[in-house]
């Protein structure tokens, strides 16, 4: 049976192979000197870890006490611990309120896996005995509603839809009212994929947020941005724009199993102080896992 840790290692293999092989080459029968430090710095930057974070890691790495002979596994252990420290703000639990409706706004650009992720989240919480509903606010694509319906059925959740091309904010409004009426525990609001620099679509998202707050000034309980791990450095722009509109509470990272750019998560967490609630490490409904910075850091360097 494949453990969660082994599945994570497999998912991060594209990034970890680069880092692990690079460290093996840099420290093969070599001393720890300025040349090797420079090579290590270049390797980490090439893995999409931000320059700011890499600089900090290298400075800390210089102060690690090593034996006279240093091997690559020892270096990997040290780097993993330093990366884990950089991710200290990432492991805030995804908490829900008891005895009230939790409104979870899900947003992101096109193709990051929002619908699939909502299906997996719905299944996760339905299995825990929660009453789950999903608002289909991507109203301009009939295919999106059909795809969402399939996932929601598998999760034994309630799907709340509007007419095709209906105002997404009106669907969100009705979904909240219906969820309150039916004593729903969690309402996931699925929004249309939108480019972060498309003003009209971002205004539409802003309108959804305003409508939510009309019904509950403390809502949404969570505003979550779905990030495709393949995105790389553009992750920073996406977080910045969506955060301005929705006041993000956290991130979910998808498609780790297909990315060679997973290192970007380290810098993103450090810059925006946002937790990573879940990570997607496969296509199956059970392949959405709670983020664990210790396991992630070790897997990232191939340990």
From Swiss-Prot:
Q: Which reaction does it catalyse?
A: GTP + H2O = GDP + phosphate + H(+)
Q: How does it sit in the membrane?
A: Peripheral membrane protein
Q: What is its main location?
A: membrane
Coiled coil spans = none
> Which Pfam families does the annotation name?
SRP54, SRP54_N
* Top-level taxon: Bacteria
Q: Which UniProt keywords apply?
A: Cell inner membrane, Cell membrane, Cytoplasm, GTP-binding, Hydrolase, Membrane, Nucleotide-binding, Receptor
Similarity-based family: Belongs to the GTP-binding SRP family. FtsY subfamily.
Oligomeric state and interaction partners are given as: Part of the signal recognition particle protein translocation system, which is composed of SRP and FtsY. SRP is a ribonucleoprotein composed of Ffh and a 4.5S RNA molecule.
Query: What name has this protein been given in UniProt?
Result: Signal recognition particle receptor FtsY
Give the organism, scientific name. Answer: Rickettsia typhi (strain ATCC VR-144 / Wilmington)
Origin organism lineage: Bacteria, Pseudomonadati, Pseudomonadota, Alphaproteobacteria, Rickettsiales
